[in-house]
Swiss-Prot record:
It holds the Pfam family Ribosomal_L9_N. This is Large ribosomal subunit protein bL9. Belongs to the bacterial ribosomal protein bL9 family. It comes from the Bacteria. The keyword RNA-binding applies. The lineage of its organism: Bacteria, Pseudomonadati, Pseudomonadota, Alphaproteobacteria, Hyphomicrobiales. It comes from Nitrobacter winogradskyi (strain ATCC 25391 / DSM 10237 / CIP 104748 / NCIMB 11846 / Nb-255). GO terms for cellular component: ribonucleoprotein complex; ribosome. Binds to the 23S rRNA. Keywords: Ribonucleoprotein, Ribosomal protein, RNA-binding, rRNA-binding. The gene is rplI. Residues 191-202 have a biased composition (Acidic residues). InterPro entries: Ribosomal_bL9, Ribosomal_bL9/RNase_H1_N, Ribosomal_bL9_bac/chp, Ribosomal_bL9_C, Ribosomal_bL9_C_sf, Ribosomal_bL9_N, Ribosomal_bL9_N_sf.
Length: 202
């Protein structure tokens, strides 16, 4: 389907451009959200009549979006989730979760504005783009952790990837070292010393 864009659409075109897209994308997203018109002769004339107003509205919206982007840009959003010892989440963090976390921080955006290629399924950090306006973007960081303490460690750049096996091995090494230096521990040379003493008494 050929459409006339009423605003800039990422990876598609600028306001006023006539582009060809799949029918489903046009009907379910672009036309429904008022981002485009069908490229008919009637709508071409309609666009020419509303072009000046659209451009004025876009300039105003772009300025407001720039103010919002300044507040969002560089934010680190923390999402707490349960995960395995290896950092694999029991579930995932989706765009819906990120939008909710932003809202809790006083930032209201819609799901289509958050660009996430695939749900987040591991503990750690990921940078995302938030399209505040078709021509204004901001970058945020999403920190996924099992606790607030762990999130702070991740934000400081600490390595939290140590596996349980590694921690167990370290604990065993510490325990072995403690036993080695225990003054009450039985040592192999004690029986020999006792035998020498018995020999002297005889």
């Amino acid at each position: 389907m050929e459409i006339i864009l009423l605003e800039r659409v990422a990876k598609l075109g600028q306001m006023g451009e006539v582009v060809k897209v799949k029918d489903g994308f046009a009907r379910n997203f672009l036309l429904r959200r008022g981002k485009a018109l069908r490229a008919t002769a009637e709508n071409r004339a309609k666009y020419d009549g509303m072009k000046a107003e659209l451009e004025a509205n876009n300039i105003k919206a772009k300025g407001e979006a720039a103010t919002v982007a300044e507040k969002i840009n560089g934010r680190d959003i923390v999402v707490i989730r349960q995960a395995s010892e290896t950092g694999q989440l029991f579930g995932s963090v989706t765009v819906r979760d990120i939008v909710a976390a932003l809202a809790a921080d006083g930032i209201i955006v819609s799901r289509p504005q958050v660009w996430l290629d695939a749900p987040i399924k591991t503990i750690g950090q990921q940078k995302l783009t938030v399209a505040v306006h078709p021509e204004v973007e901001a970058e945020i960081t999403v920190t996924v952790a099992r606790s607030v303490d762990e999130a702070e460690r991740i934000q400081r750049g600490e390595d939290i990837s140590t596996r349980r096996e590694d921690r167990d091995a370290a604990a065993e090494a510490i325990a072995a070292a403690g036993e080695f230096f225990d003054p009450d521990a039985q040592h192999d040379d004690e029986p020999a010393a006792e035998d020498d003493q018995n020999a002297e008494e005889k």
